[in-house]
């Protein structure tokens, strides 16, 4: 999730604190709030993008895993390799076919060697440039992730801990005061109206007089509800009822993908051409190398939490566990009753993020 400290008009936490079910409109869209008072959403809990980094009886860490890093590394290897293959093999071979159309009796190898020398220099420049772009993409994204620590949700204390970028000083606030929302923004693309959906959280820092905003793009509002429901389910019910810890990528990922490919071939779900393409594509992208890059990303970016919250993260005796507020219990019971009667979160609060703002944008 991306973070920001900018105060936005649609989420005025200082002068007009929102509550669950409230809808606020802004210039290009609207937001429906899921908390304060984190009530049930009625959606199945889903961990979008593998963000549950640690799940245990005391706390949940939500951040960015290295899922997708091996694919990014493969793309970054494929770009220079594509340039090299085109310049050193494809172009000289095509030039060599010119022997069939020339009246001077020049051989295939005459044209091939002539273009090969040119392709060698071309591949050095284009392949080198593509390699530099790929290295920058891989390293910069890993370094950016390493600067951001995960958000820690302590279910026994019913508190949330957030570390601003570059700081070892925690910002801790009560769980029931955490602001969460799903928003839609609409705009014109020249041929129609396009909507983008965002799941967000806000952590209030009264000591620093700041509000830290955290955002993640989601495919639909229901995905945002499901992401929040996964966090809420952990805090209210425990680790046995929410998604488990996200898996990380490494050499074992390559082994599993190869084993899956072989099983697909054995069960007639993949052709011999598909098997050949799998091996060819992985040879071109340097076999296990992208998965070693993913393992490096995991080691470099997944730093341990500072000692400043070591005591805060220790388990408490059950008699010291914080409990739900009466207001949350009542509102949760009301929502559960509405769900049993066939309503969902959006209809209960009369929120429709996908239609209202689209009509307003078209009228504008």
Residues covered by each model-derived region:
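Short, non-transmembrane cytosolic segments of multipass membrane proteins
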Residues: 2-54
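Short, hydrophobic/proline-enriched secondary-structure or compact coil segments at domain edges
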Residues: 53-71, 197-199
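Juxtamembrane amphipathic/hinge helix adjacent to a transmembrane helix
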Residues: 55-62, 242-270
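Alpha-helical transmembrane spans
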Residues: 65-147, 264-364
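N-terminal topogenic membrane-targeting module
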Residues: 140-168
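Short, mixed charged/polar active-site loops
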Residues: 150, 168-172, 208-213
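Phosphoinositide-dependent membrane-docking surfaces
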Residues: 159-160, 168-188
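A membrane-cytosol interface segment of integral membrane proteins
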Residues: 179-252
């Amino acid at each position: 999730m991306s973070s920001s400290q900018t105060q936005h008009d649609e989420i005025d936490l200082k002068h007009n604190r929102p509550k669950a079910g409230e809808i606020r409109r802004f210039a290009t869209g609207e937001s429906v709030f899921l908390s304060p008072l984190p009530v049930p959403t009625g959606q199945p809990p889903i961990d979008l993008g593998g963000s549950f980094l640690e799940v245990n009886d005391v706390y949940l860490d939500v951040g960015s895993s290295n899922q997708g890093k091996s694919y990014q590394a493969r793309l970054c290897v494929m770009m220079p390799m594509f340039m090299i293959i085109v310049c050193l093999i494809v172009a000289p071979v095509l030039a060599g076919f010119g022997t069939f159309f020339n009246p001077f009796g020049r051989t295939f190898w005459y044209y091939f060697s002539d273009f090969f020398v040119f392709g060698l220099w071309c591949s050095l420049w284009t392949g080198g440039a593509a390699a530099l772009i790929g290295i920058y993409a891989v390293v910069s994204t890993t370094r950016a992730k390493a600067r951001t620590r995960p958000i820690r949700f302590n279910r026994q204390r019913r508190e949330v801990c957030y570390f601003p970028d570059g700081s070892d000083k925690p910002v801790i606030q009560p769980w029931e005061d955490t602001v969460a929302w799903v928003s839609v923004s609409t705009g014109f693309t020249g041929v129609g109206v396009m909507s983008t959906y965002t799941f967000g959280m806000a952590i209030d820092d009264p000591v620093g007089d700041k509000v830290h905003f955290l955002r993640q793009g989601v495919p639909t509002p229901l995905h945002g509800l499901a992401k929040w429901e996964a966090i809420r389910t952990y805090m209210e019910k425990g680790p046995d009822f929410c998604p488990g810890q996200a898996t990380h990528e490494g050499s074992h990922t390559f082994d599993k993908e190869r084993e899956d490919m072989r099983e697909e071939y054995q069960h007639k779900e993949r052709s011999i051409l598909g098997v050949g393409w799998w091996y060819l594509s992985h040879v071109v992208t340097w076999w296990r190398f992208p998965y070693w890059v993913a393992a490096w990303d995991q080691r470099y970016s997944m730093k341990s939490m500072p000692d400043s919250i070591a005591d805060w993260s220790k388990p408490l005796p059950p008699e010291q566990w914080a409990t739900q507020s009466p207001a949350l219990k009542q509102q949760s019971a009301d929502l559960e009753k509405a769900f049993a009667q066939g309503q969902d979160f959006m209809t209960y609060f009369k929120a429709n993020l996908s239609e209202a703002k689209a009509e307003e944008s078209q009228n504008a």
